[in-house]
Structures are given as C-alpha cells and as structure tokens.
C-alpha cells in the first residue's frame, strides 16, 4: 500500500522511508510530485498543524497521507521555538541561522537549565478526512556548541545526556531508535493496520 509523506524535507523523507519501508509500505513524498497543496500552518500545536497538512493532502491526492509537524521546545524559553522551530530566525532562514539564534538566546543559561525536547506529531489521513494522530518526544538539553554532521535542523545542538552525544553524532539507525519521530512512528505502527483497514 502506498503512503504519501507530506513533506519536501529530504531529511524527514529519509527517516520515514526507512521506518515505513520496513513495514512493507511504498513511501512517496511531495518530492515525487510536481504539484501539491501548500498548507498554511495556522495551528497552535504540533498536532493541529500535522492534521491540517495530512487532511488537505489526502483529499488532494486521493491516497493515505502522513504528515508531521515537529520541532524543539526549550524549557528556558517557555517552550519556544515550538511550532515556529523551522522559522525561528525568520521566514526562509537556514538551519544555521536558527541554531545561531538559539545559542544567542541561551548564552547566559547554565547547563542545568537548558533542558529541551524534540516533539513530533504525526497525522495519517484518509481521503475521507478521517485522521489518526500520535505524538512522540525525545528529551535532552541544548549544548553550548554544535557537534556532529549526521542530522539536520537543531540536531547538532541537541545533546542526549545518557549518550553524551548530540542527535547529529548518531547514525541514522541509532537516531531512529530513540528519536521523537521514531517514538511517534512506533505509536502509529501499533494502530496503522486497523486504521487503514488492512
């Protein structure tokens, strides 16, 4: 069965293909299509944004669509950047700009107050509009410098204390086993067959 992942983010596409592919699903993404809806993320939560995207794309394509909304919540910043994680430094800014702004905002924050979590809300929608939405998290803290080259987004700053490594220092399989997206996919997997009626 085909599932379309509603993203053009190559990093996310790779993670979804690895995880859903092993379950036997044919995974496509918006990178495989010339046209697709551009959903405005007007939700105030990760779950609301994920559902907006999956419902609109499922109606457009006539197939099951999986979308995510994910980001970083930093406790010392009252949960920011939150749903604005991708545009923390402004519209069309790079990961480097977002990471630089995060380090700037936390410059005077000691290590014990730099707790944070990655959050991923996944929403799988049928063309009928019915959705299945789950949430996964990965706890950690924000480091003082970027380390690692394997990830994307805030991964080089996100330290996992139990491993003493950043998310960007992990291999894809190591990250998938503990990541917020991996946790959300495990929850989704448990309900996927029933939801899709297979």
UniProtKB/Swiss-Prot annotation:
UniProt GO MF annotations: dITP diphosphatase activity; ITP diphosphatase activity; metal ion binding; nucleotide binding; ribonucleoside triphosphate phosphatase activity; XTP diphosphatase activity
Catalytic activity entry: XTP + H2O = XMP + diphosphate + H(+); dITP + H2O = dIMP + diphosphate + H(+); ITP + H2O = IMP + diphosphate + H(+)
Organism domain of life: Bacteria
ATP-binding keyword on record: no
EC supergroup of this enzyme: hydrolase
GO annotations of cellular component type: cytosol
Active-site residues annotated for this sequence: 69 (proton acceptor)
UniProt entry keywords in alphabetical sequence: Hydrolase, Magnesium, Metal-binding, Nucleotide metabolism, Nucleotide-binding
InterPro entries tied to this protein: dITP/XTP_pyrophosphatase, ITPase-like_fam, RdgB/HAM1
Cofactors demanded by this protein: Mg(2+)
HAMAP family: Non_canon_purine_NTPase
Family under the similarity heading: Belongs to the HAM1 NTPase family.
Role noted for this protein: Pyrophosphatase that catalyzes the hydrolysis of nucleoside triphosphates to their monophosphate derivatives, with a high preference for the non-canonical purine nucleotides XTP (xanthosine triphosphate), dITP (deoxyinosine triphosphate) and ITP. Seems to function as a house-cleaning enzyme that removes non-canonical purine nucleotides from the nucleotide pool, thus preventing their incorporation into DNA/RNA and avoiding chromosomal lesions.
Protein name per its UniProtKB record: dITP/XTP pyrophosphatase
